[in-house]
C-alpha cells in the first residue's frame, strides 16, 4: 500500500498484479475474500489466468461497495479491475471495470441497485460442466458459457453472507468435476 498526502486528505493507493499459469493436467481453485475499499482509497487489480489444454481452473473475485458498517458505501475514489483468461495463447475472456463514485455521481444506476456486493467467477473445465440452477432468492446470479470449456458466473448480493453461499455452491460444482482439486484461499 502506498500512501500520499493530497491536499488535506490522505489518499491510499493499492495495486495488485496476479498471474497464474496452469500446465496440462494441472488443477487449481483460486478464491479470496471480497475487496473492500475504504473511504478515499484507490484500488487497481490486474489478473492474468493462463491454462494449457487439459488443465482445470476455478477463479473467484468479489468486491464490496466499501466498509458498509462504517458508513463508507461508495466513498472510495477508484476501484479498477482487469481480468484476462488465455487458453493456450488465445485470449478467451477479457473483463475491465472502472468505478469512480465521485465522478459518476450518486444517482448513477451502475450502483448495482440494492446490491453492495458483487462477484465474478470463471471455471475452465476440460469436460462437460453443469452449473447449479437454484441460487439464493436474495441475489441475482447469471451463468454463461463464454468459450469452449469456459464458464462465467456473475452475481449481485445484499451482503457477504449471501455472497459466501453463492461462492460455496459454485465451488461445490467445480469439485464435482474433479474431487482432487487443489485450492488456494487468499
Where are the predicted features?
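Internal, conserved structured core segments that host functional sites
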Residues: 13-72
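Single conserved hydrophobic/aromatic residue that forms the stacking wall/gate
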Residues: 1-7, 11-12
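Generic structural microfeature
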Residues: 5-6, 42, 116
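Short, structurally constrained coil/turn elements
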Residues: 4, 51-53, 137
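A structural signal for small-residue-enriched, beta-sheet-centric alpha/beta enzyme cores
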Residues: 61-186
Amino acid at each position: 500500500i502506498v500512501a500520499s498526502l493530497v491536499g488535506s486528505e490522505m489518499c491510499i493507493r493499492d495495486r495488485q498484479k496476479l498471474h497464474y499459469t496452469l500446465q496440462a493436467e494441472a488443477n487449481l481453485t483460486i478464491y479470496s475474500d471480497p475487496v473492500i475499499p475504504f473511504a478515499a482509497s484507490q484500488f487497481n487489480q490486474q489478473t492474468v489466468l493462463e491454462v494449457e489444454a487439459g488443465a482445470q481452473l476455478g477463479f473467484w473475485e468479489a468486491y464490496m461497495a466499501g466498509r458498509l458498517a462504517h458508513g463508507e458505501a461508495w466513498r472510495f475514489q477508484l476501484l479498477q479491475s482487469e481480468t484476462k483468461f488465455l487458453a493456450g495463447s488465445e485470449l478467451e475472456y477479457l473483463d475491465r471495470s472502472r468505478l469512480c463514485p465521485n465522478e459518476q455521481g450518486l444517482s448513477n444506476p451502475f450502483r448495482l441497485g440494492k446490491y453492495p456486493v458483487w462477484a465474478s467467477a470463471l471455471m475452465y473445465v476440460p469436460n462437460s460442466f453443469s452449473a447449479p440452477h437454484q441460487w439464493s432468492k436474495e441475489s441475482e446470479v447469471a451463468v454463461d458459457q463464454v468459450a469452449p470449456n469456459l464458464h462465467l458466473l456473475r452475481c449481485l448480493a445484499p451482503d457477504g453472507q449471501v455472497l459466501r453461499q453463492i461462492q460455496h455452491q459454485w465451488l461445490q460444482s467445480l469439485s464435482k468435476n474433479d474431487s482432487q482439486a487443489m485450492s488456494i484461499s487468499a
